Amino acid sequence: LLMTGFVAFISSLSLMAQHKVEMVPFGDMDQWVDRQIKESGIIGGNTKNVYEIAPTAVIQGDQVYKNMGGSPWGTSNVMAKVAGITKTNTSVFPEKRGEGYCARLDTRMESVKVLGLVNITVLAAGSIFTGTVHEPIKGTKNPQKMLQCGVPFTKKPVALQFDYKVKMSDRENRIRATGFSKITDV
């Protein structure tokens, strides 16, 4: 899924049906933070790029991320530290489109297997939302607890406007992969 162009709220200006399109901060998807996080050596020790929608910056190391520069956007990109192992997921990333960028949202399987200590496979769906993620992720139980969805608004939007393009899976069934359970069709 690609979210392109801009994300805007259409706010009511008066009791009459007049509307004004206003950009949500960073809604054009042209500015990204590139977090460069080294995963644990026991799973390869590779440095991974974990992206966030916020003022352009590069952050090196496994620092916990907090929304920067007034950005209201959270993503499903995360850093996890489970049983002392640092692992990342990037399923939302910038993709060039025209003169700027769009947000590409992918769904993928993420696996971590370590010498009988950890054996996790999860379905990681790309998503963006207003809010934050509480890092680091420390397990797969109650993932909604790690999300703080929503941000305060002082206006009353009546609509959300955005461009998108989607490529659907060719699988007949959806799958469920939550971490410690068996992967099943749903």
Task: Report the location of each language-model feature.
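Aromatic (Trp/Tyr/Phe) and Gly/Pro-enriched flexible surface segments
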Residues: 18-161, 176-179, 183-186
